[in-house]
Amino acid sequence: MYNNNRLAKSSPEPSKAIQENTTSPHWCEPVQNGFRTFRIEDSFQTGMTAPFPHDTMEKKAREVTIVSYVGVLRSDEGIIGFSDSRCSYQNDGVCQYVADDVKKVFKGTDFIIATYGANVVYGEDQKPERLEKVLDRILTGFSGTHRDFFEKLQVTMRAHFSSHLNDQFHFLIGFRDYDGLFGTEECRVSRLGVEYSGPSYESGYRTGGYQHFGPKDLIIPFNLSVERMRKLAEVIVDSTERMGNLCLDYNPVGGKVQIEVLS
């Protein structure tokens, strides 16, 4: 259940479907860090506190996936958003390298977002533009909560969704509420609107994208300092990349480590 005193007053209560859909086949057993796992597909998992209700989009929407590795860490001391910088397309299980300079972590006044999944936006002229440019443009001079931000993003992308009906844009969020408390949340932006997992104020972490070699059931002490979380994020991405290099002919995780801090 949302705490309206902590989140923006303009933010809606979660839909009844989100609150009550605890029997979805996408649910897994709770994990030690207090979050549950929502299966986007067998190869891509992300920790969530509630399932998204709209998972009946056509299968072809997932035949081509933009592979990333991103995450957020949360303690009572602050939030760390992190990611690699590699962009790869996966089609029928085969990865194709695109670039090692893709920005995936962004910071607003009171929130950090990390994005994975689709990262190309088509405007009214149907010319492609990197998602990072759209996000940076909206963030310039933006004042408001993360939910205000995503509502604005969805409106901005209406032209895209009118011609790309099945595209989904995924985000991990770390935020500071009106009481100064730190929380995490996830959302998905699609033609159906903006869907939220529901906020959590527990110390812990969320990751998204290609997670086969990432940490599982990582424990984040409630008093872990921001500096230590920053170093931990660097270790997480570095070790994930190293293990992938050992095991895979092509590693979809790579490039420079990106980190943003909210404290």
Language model features: what each stretch is:
Residues S10-S11, S15, S24, S43:
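Serine residues within intrinsically disordered or low-complexity segments
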Residues R36, S43-Q45, P53:
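Short hydrophobic targeting helices and cationic amphipathic motifs
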Residues K59-S263:
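N-terminal nucleophile
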